[in-house]
């Protein structure tokens, strides 16, 4: 029986943080280890260039860092094909054909793109590559005939745009060579988008409000001890608020089942008064370190031989290119432009 295909990836614009870990990485490793799927995981460097065109050095440096993060959390190149987007030229050619099937107005209506354009402050100077990146994503997904694409809830419009392109292509060229994907969305809404340590709605590289998978133990400790809690909880005996308190928010996400009774007791104690922020932060630190310590150890080990890390990426890219080339050939045959 053929295994369903999963495609997922990240933009290499810096090291990955806890938001990436709970939002996608942890689930990828789970899906990989279930051994029920064929996994493709990629570093979307071309997409990163759509809004970092003048920062190619950052992207180049981030390729190695993100690859280390992948390996350290448990993604295994023997079980998952890990590749670099720019090393698969077939993706750019597929994008070109798909762009002929999507109007500019449709791209401008994409809610995810509209939100991101506003956040990035492009104004009237929107890079054309950024505006059409949903088409590039469709090429990424369809090149590997992905059945399932794990994404955050904010990416639902991107999946729907890909599905539209697939339907349009298959209808226009009387074929079924492209597969219509389904999105896999986070069950835990809190984990789907981890807030920053400062209480900001999202943990973000640009805001510097995150804990990175590569942070050493001392850095993690300092960051946890500086976390946003309840600004009105000045004295230990003061009643404290749970809502909006990042320490308790993180505890809800990272705690295991066996921790739940302790956490509920801490919440009650905190709200009544008599429990200080230092104690709750130390408790959270222990829980985070339980998760981060083995990741950190593996990362340090892999970092000793970056040549091997890049050999893994090269092999994965070669493997991925073979698959993408087959899809491209089918697409061109359907269009009647496979001349030779």
UniProtKB/Swiss-Prot annotation:
Reaction catalysed by this enzyme: tRNA(Trp) + L-tryptophan + ATP = L-tryptophyl-tRNA(Trp) + AMP + diphosphate + H(+)
Binding-site residues, L-tryptophan: 140
Main localization, broad class: cytoplasm
NCBIfam families: trpS (TIGR00233)
EC number(s) reported in the record: 6.1.1.2
Molecular function terms, GO-annotated: ATP binding; tryptophan-tRNA ligase activity
Locus of motif 'HIGH' region: 12-20
Gene3D superfamilies named among the record's database cross-references: HUPs (3.40.50.620), Tyrosyl-Transfer RNA Synthetase (1.10.240.10)
CDD domains cross-referenced by the UniProt entry: TrpRS_core
Free-text function comment from the UniProt entry: Catalyzes the attachment of tryptophan to tRNA(Trp).
SUPFAM superfamilies per record: Nucleotidylyl transferase
Binding residue positions for ATP: 11-13, 19-20, 152-154, 194, 202-206
Identification of the protein by name: Tryptophan--tRNA ligase
GO cellular component: cytosol
Span(s) of short sequence motif 'KMSKS' region: 202-206
Source domain of life: Bacteria
Lineage: Bacteria, Bacillati, Bacillota, Bacilli, Lactobacillales
Pfam families reported in the protein's UniProt record: tRNA-synt_1b
Compartments it resides in: Cytoplasm
